[in-house]
Amino acid sequence: MKKAFLLVFAIACTHFLFAQPQQANQPATDPANAQAPYLRFPTLPPFHLLKLDSATFLTKDDVKKHRRTIIMFFSPDCDHCKRQTDSILADFDHFKDIEIVMATYQPFPEMKEFYAHYRLSEHPNIKMGRDEKFFLVPYYKIRNLPYLALYDKKGNLITTFEGTQKTSTILNAFEQKEHGE
């Protein structure tokens, strides 16, 4: 019994010795690799989203120029994403001049059902597409949904949010940017 315990203990110890993610002489973090791409390139990203018609694509060139923009990464079955959509639509008078790009990685039927349920076709400034190439998650290093990236009229990043935000928080971020310039 003692020998079995010692054997298991020795195996466990060697596991921890060899489980180090990097060599001892390497720096703990490489700033170029640690920084998310959206911080290195703080403008509208080159996304490529499959539109609801499942034949054409939504790209950054389809976003109206000289307008504030929100890129919202969401999941149709996420309760926080539903609440965020509800709050934006409830306060839509303040969002009607903001381009909203809603992107998801979830299956097409779920995305279409979400679009229909919230009657997003009634809002021409809201565009939706499926991130089939899974570009946005690593680009923003998304961990929580909904994820919101706010851009000014010039297409420059203002800030990002993870999780449900009050509409006043979103609108204040835009206002601070405009009044700070």
Language-model region placement:
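Thiol-/selenol-based redox modules, centered on thioredoxin-like
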Residues: N144, L150-E181
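Short active-site neighborhood of thiol/selenol oxidoreductases, capturing the structured segment around
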Residues: T59-K82, I88
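Short, internal strand/loop/helix patches
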Residues: Y118-A149
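Hydrophobic alpha-helical segments, especially N-terminal targeting/anchoring helices
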Residues: H15, L50-K51, Y151
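Bacterial Sec-dependent N-terminal signal peptides
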Residues: M1-A24, K177-E181
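Structural microenvironment flanking redox-active thiols in thiol-disulfide oxidoreductases
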Residues: K82-L120, F135-P138
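N-terminal "domain-start" segment that seeds a small globular fold
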Residues: Q23-D61
